Amino acid sequence: MSVELEEALPVTTAEGMAKKVTKAGGSAALSPSKKRKNSKKKNQPGKYSQLVVETIRRLGERNGSSLAKIYTEAKKVPWFDQQNGRTYLKYSIKALVQNDTLLQVKGTGANGSFKLNRKKLEGGGERRGAPAAATAPAPTAHKAKKAAPGAAGSRRADKKPARGQKPEQRSHKKGAGAKKDKGGKAKKTAAAGGKKVKKAAKPSVPKVPKGRK
């Protein structure tokens, strides 16, 4: 029996080691995805910070909004934590002040009044939109270059008929002269024909010899 147990024990230990290795491999495979999720969460602003910015924008007070006003407006959101939400708002306000997203108008710490730093908020949007605005005029320049040869061709086409108009005028003049010449020739031929007709109009009288009377 002891021999059989000795033979069976290494098998069980080997199976246990294999299971441990597979578990360790699974945890190692899952760890990079967890790290990525954590890095994304760190890069993105917290939802309470976004809530603070939105509430201050909604209130729109010139002299800044206090923590009490921000809290009363922010707690209307359905996902707001009613127990710890106020402390989360304090931390997010401090972070936004350090970030230069918020300007502290009055007081010190989280007990003062806060206002949005519009230069930073609007400047970020302008910087993002600047490359797109810079690249936008490029296609219009290409279109203008493409349109320029067409315009030059149309100008050349306009100039060519101008040259061709002079021969037309000359041809008209020649045509008028030709008409005049033809008219003069027709008159001359008509006059000559009239003379011939007049000459032919005289009747030819047969001459009678004098000796036969």
UniProtKB/Swiss-Prot annotation:
Residues 22-49, 107-213 are annotated as: Disordered. The modification N6-acetyllysine is found at K47. Residues 44-118 form the H15 domain. It is found in: Nucleus; Chromosome. The keyword DNA-binding applies. GO terms for cellular component: chromosome; nucleolus; nucleoplasm; nucleosome; nucleus. The keyword Lipid metabolism does not apply. Residues 33-44 have a biased composition (Basic residues). The modification N-acetylserine is found at S2. It comes from the Eukaryota. One of its GO terms (biological process) is nucleosome assembly. CDD domains: H15 (cd00073). Keywords: Acetylation, Chromosome, Citrullination, DNA-binding, Nucleus, Phosphoprotein. Interacts with RRP1B. Belongs to the histone H1/H5 family. This is Histone H1.10. It comes from Homo sapiens. The gene is H1-10.
